[in-house]
């Protein structure tokens, strides 16, 4: 026992031997003294614990050897269990596992266990492991054609070699850390669990074969993709930041801007583990406007600066979600008469704070323009600036708008939302993963607040084109099959999320009631159906390019509209939305699988297009891109982006302003952003515009040059790029206004 468990005290030894201290202490003390006098044991004077001497360890090893030889002669086996103990083999445990884990009938379980025992005795293995026994049982199940039982009995996890590879390669992925290694290993387990236990074989096989791509597979069974927060219950003090007040302190309603921002910081921090990709705060400057009344500009900025630094220290988008603020250039009409939480309680309505709304927005944009102490950009939050019909109505609004264009010109970390379009509805909210929700679902609150994307299924459109061989009816039929798989997967996702919230209590904030419903409106949260490879599918199917042929464009629109109409027909049983955005790079995986399946030749194959309806690696006039994007944005209500990637020299602030105004007044574009590339040299702490392999200032050309650009709609440091993102950054074409 001491050989196995380490040094133990007199009392601990008696407890492990299940001896009674009152009746057995004398007898036990006598035997312990004999072992000590024989120099098999010795006592540590400081701790009072007994340990094996060198001689005692040798005797212990000899006894183990004799016992092992006797067991082998008798045909007995020892098992290293998954609970990290060594126990004699018991066949009944195989029977119990088969019944418990796979619902195998007892008679069949008895038969399989006997066969497994016979096979395990043959190799004369000194120590069996639970994993090895499971492999033998699974092999027997396969031989008997009992594959469904084998599925349920499969042990999840990585082989030893794969774990070693994960450890060795993690230093070259994202931001390396031991926690990142741990997360990568856990990701593999939960992804396998999703394939084997949660999704039907048809859906799992469709993903693994490359017909579809399940985004966030590692978190599919644990949490939704994103959330649109409503900060008002927290500002009122109705709910603690974690929902329960158990994990975090329960604070009273904040009485100052500093307190309000602390509350938001705590909310975002506690919620970062509850969603996979993104968190968004709508009406950020409107809801916080009451807290800056009578404050000086300098005081507002000092408090806000600390808040922004805190966000950027905590949220990098690798180990946790990224943050977006949806901000307004005016108090929307539907909020003007809504009661406003303030330092004095619910005093007044939001319409009373129109001046403060713009003052806070101006301060936020000033600080985002500043960057950090090393003149690098602040990547959090992503700003979505909503431009309603009265966006240019006041001088103060115009000043804020010009600050936003200055941010676009300097860092590019701002997205412009055309809220004046009828199809954008009364209110629209975007997340930093570019998911979109609007008020066409019920109303502006139920549709856009306390909701989030369940997740995203991307359809491999080129695979459908290869199978239909130019036949429109076959294309439509195969697309419908994939849409039905996507819908089924998202329905399952909603059921799983309901279990996590209601039964498993893994998402405590989401289940806490506010206004007679859970904080997270699960039934109002959409599942997204997106697509990859639209231009490639159209080219293969029609032989024509979307960018320069009306027939090709019509076919592309028809395909995307089919996704949108199918999603609409699924309502109201489940809220589904079509999207042109994936939450993670998927195109390279799908391209590689199509190469492996023989649809493409490896040498000539180019990566499919994603996050765009025209290939970004091909030089296409900006006007053509604009014309196409305008059409597709209106039928992809779950997410889209017109990413205007510009080269150097970059346009002036005034040119950006005039261009955006013209687009928003004359086209149907709902969301656009300007992307500017820049390089940060850690060696000399200098930012240079463009992607440079040698620092223009100090000529440094080593690995401390860090590139920044939007990859798939989001600014990321090159230290966090995947290979797909690196290829995207360097191969996508830049335009000029």
Ranges and model annotations:
Residues 701-737:
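Long, charge-rich boundary regions
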Residues 170-523, 544, 549-707:
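Conserved catalytic cores of very large enzyme subunits
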Residues 68-175, 727-734:
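Charged, amphipathic alpha-helical regulatory modules used
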């Amino acid at each position: 026992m001491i050989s196995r468990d380490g040094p133990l005290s007199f009392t601990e030894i008696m407890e492990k031997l299940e001896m009674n201290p009152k009746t057995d202490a004398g007898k036990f003390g006598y035997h312990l003294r004999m072992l000590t006098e024989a120099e098999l044991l010795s006592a540590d004077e400081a701790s009072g614990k007994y340990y094996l001497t060198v001689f005692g360890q040798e005797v212990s090893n000899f006894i183990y050897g004799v016992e092992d030889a006797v067991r082998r002669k008798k045909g007995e086996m020892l098992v290293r269990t998954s609970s990290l103990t060594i126990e004699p083999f018991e066949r009944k445990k195989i029977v119990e596992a088969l019944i418990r884990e796979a619902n195998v009938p007892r008679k069949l379980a008895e038969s399989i266990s006997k066969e497994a025992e016979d096979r395990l005795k043959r190799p004369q293995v000194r120590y069996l492991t639970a994993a090895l026994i499971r492999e033998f049982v699974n092999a027997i199940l396969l031989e008997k054609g009992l594959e469904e039982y084998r599925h349920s009995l499969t042990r999840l996890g990585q082989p030893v070699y794969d774990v070693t590879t994960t450890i060795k390669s993690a230093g070259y992925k994202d931001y390396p850390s031991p926690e990142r290694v741990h997360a990568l290993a856990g990701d593999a387990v939960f992804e396998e669990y999703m394939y084997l236990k949660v999704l039907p074989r048809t859906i799992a096989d469709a993903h693994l074969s490359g017909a579809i791509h399940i985004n966030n597979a590692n978190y599919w069974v644990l949490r939704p993709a994103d959330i649109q927060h409503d900060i008002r219950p927290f500002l009122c003090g109705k709910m603690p930041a974690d929902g329960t007040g158990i994990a975090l302190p329960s604070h009273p309603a904040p009485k100052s801007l500093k307190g309000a921002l602390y509350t938001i910081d705590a909310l975002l921090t506690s919620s970062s583990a509850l969603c996979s990709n993104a968190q968004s705060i709508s009406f950020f400057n409107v809801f916080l406007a009451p807290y800056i009344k009578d404050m000086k500009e300098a005081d507002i900025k000092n408090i806000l600066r600390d808040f922004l630094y805190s966000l950027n220290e905590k949220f990098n988008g690798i180990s946790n979600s990224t943050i977006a603020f949806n901000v307004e250039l005016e108090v929307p009409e539907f909020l003007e008469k809504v009661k406003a939480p303030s330092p004095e309680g619910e005093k007044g309505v939001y319409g009373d704070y129109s001046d403060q709304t713009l003052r806070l927005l101006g301060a936020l944009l000033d600080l985002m323009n500043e960057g950090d102490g090393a003149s690098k950009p602040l990547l959090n939050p992503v700003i979505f600036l909503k431009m309603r019909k009265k966006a240019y109505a006041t001088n103060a609004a115009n000043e804020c708008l010009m600050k936003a264009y200055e941010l676009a010109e300097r860092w590019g970390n701002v997205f412009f939302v055309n809220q004046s379009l009828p199809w954008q509805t009364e209110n629209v909210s975007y997340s930093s993963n570019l998911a979109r929700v609007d008020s066409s679902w019920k109303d502006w609150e139920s549709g856009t607040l306390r909701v989030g994307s369940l997740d995203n299924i991307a359809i491999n459109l080129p695979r459908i084109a290869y199978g239909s061989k130019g036949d429109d009816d076959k294309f439509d039929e195969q697309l419908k099959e994939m849409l039905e798989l996507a819908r089924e997967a998202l329905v399952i996702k909603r059921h799983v999320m309901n279990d996590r919230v209601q039964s498993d209590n893994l998402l405590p904030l989401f289940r806490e009631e506010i206004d007679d419903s859970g904080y997270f409106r699960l039934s109002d949260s959409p599942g997204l159906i997106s697509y990859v490879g639209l231009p490639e599918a159209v080219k293969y199917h029609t032989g024509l390019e979307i960018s320069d042929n009306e027939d090709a464009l019509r076919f592309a629109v028809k395909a995307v509209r089919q996704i949108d109409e199918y999603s609409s027909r699924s309502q109201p049983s489940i809220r589904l939305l079509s999207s042109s955005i994936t939450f993670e790079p998927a195109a390279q995986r799908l391209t590689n699988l199509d190469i492996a399946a023989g649809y493409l030749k490896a040498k000539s194959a180019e990566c499919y297009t994603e996050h765009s309806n025209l290939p970004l690696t091909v030089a296409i006039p900006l006007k053509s891109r604009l014309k196409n994007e305008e059409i597709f944005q209106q039928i992809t209500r779950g997410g889209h982006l017109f990413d205007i990637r510009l080269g150097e020299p970059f346009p002036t602030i005034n040119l950006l302003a005039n261009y955006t105004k013209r687009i928003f007044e004359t086209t149907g574009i709902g969301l656009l952003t300007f992307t500017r590339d820049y390089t940060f040299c850690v060696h000399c702490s200098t930012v240079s515009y463009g992607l440079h392999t040698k620092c223009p200032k100090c000529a440094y050309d080593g690995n401390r040059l860090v590139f920044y650009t939007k990859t798939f709609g989001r600014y990321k440091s090159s230290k966090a790029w995947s290979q797909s993102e690196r290829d995207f950054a360097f191969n996508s074409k830049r335009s000029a206004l």
